[in-house]
UniProtKB/Swiss-Prot annotation:
SUPFAM superfamilies in alphabetical order: Ribulose-phoshate binding barrel (SSF51366)
Similarity comment text for this entry: Belongs to the OMP decarboxylase family. Type 1 subfamily.
Listed pathway(s): Pyrimidine metabolism; UMP biosynthesis via de novo pathway; UMP from orotate: step 2/2
Reactions catalysed: orotidine 5'-phosphate + H(+) = UMP + CO2
Binding site for substrate: 17, 39, 66-75, 125, 186, 195, 215-216
Species assigned in the record: Buchnera aphidicola subsp. Acyrthosiphon pisum (strain APS)
Cited InterPro entries: Aldolase_TIM, OMPdecase, OMPdecase_AS, OMPdecase_bac, OMPdeCOase_dom, RibuloseP-bd_barrel
Protein name (Swiss-Prot/TrEMBL): Orotidine 5'-phosphate decarboxylase
Highest taxon of source: Bacteria
Length: 236
């Protein structure tokens, strides 16, 4: 299997979206930690907690703790510090939490010699434009994502989570150092599930996305390694 970390293509983060440890470890034991990153979201973290994060870290994996912190600045400061203590590689907060919250999260990492990347979530891939209007925001989804991207960049964050179609413009505006993480990656035969803003792995490469997050396409596959190989080859 080609290593996307060596070649000029998006790196792959596997979302461990399982309801139990046994199922998660069945997949983890097939993966090479020098090739793949792992994402732990709210479901797995709620079920298995900090201990599971540490176990995966000890196996040599870089962990993206995707808890999307969104609270008052002091709470986010303390939560960010606690998360960084786990030795994670990347952590997410919600960009819509505002300037003060984002700056507090960034400040929480100052004392760490090797701080995790701090990433802001702009719009979920399940998000539709009508949803903005429902909460009183009368701009397009693209404008909304760009505004939150600028806010996060101004606050010193390392990058954003955003749908793939906005990535190219964000790279142009903020440069290559500003990391883009994109979920909603599907190859042609995959089901959409509950995601609307999706792109293919090949498009992710074209848009200069740094990391792609792949969940159900892999976790629900009968042959996840074969599927991953297919995804990597599609980006060549």
């Amino acid at each position: 299997m080609l290593n996307p970390n060596i070649f000029h293509m998006p790196k792959i983060i596997i979302a461990l979206d399982f309801c139990n440890k046994k199922s998660a470890m069945k997949l983890v034991n097939l993966l090479n930690p020098s090739i793949f990153y792992l994402k732990i979201g709210k479901e797995m973290f709620t079920i298995l907690g900090c201990k599971f994060v540490k176990e995966l870290h000890q196996l040599g994996f870089n962990i993206f703790l995707d808890l999307k912190f969104h609270d008052i600045p002091n709470t986010v400061f303390n939560a960010t510090k606690a998360a960084a203590d786990l030795g994670i590689w990347m952590l997410s907060v919600h960009a819509s939490g505002g300037k003060e919250m984002l700056i507090s999260a960034k400040k929480a990492l100052k004392s760490f010699k090797k701080a995790p990347l701090l990433i802001a979530v702009t719009a979920l891939t399940s998000f539709k434009e009508e949803a903005l209007k429902e909460i009183g925001i009368n701009i397009s989804l693209t404008e909304y994502i760009l505004k939150l991207s600028k806010l996060s960049n101004d606050c010193g964050l390392d990058g954003i989570v955003c749908p793939g179609k906005e990535a190219k413009k964000i790279k142009f505006l903020f440069g290559n150092k500003y990391k883009i993480i994109t979920p909603g990656i599907r190859i042609a035969k995959d089901l959409l599930y509950d995601q609307n803003n999706i792109i293919t792995p090949k498009e992710a490469k074209e848009y200069k996305i740094d990391y792609i997050v792949i969940g159900r396409s892999i976790t629900m596959s009968k042959n996840p390694i074969k599927k991953l190989d297919l995804i990597i080859k599609s980006m060549q």
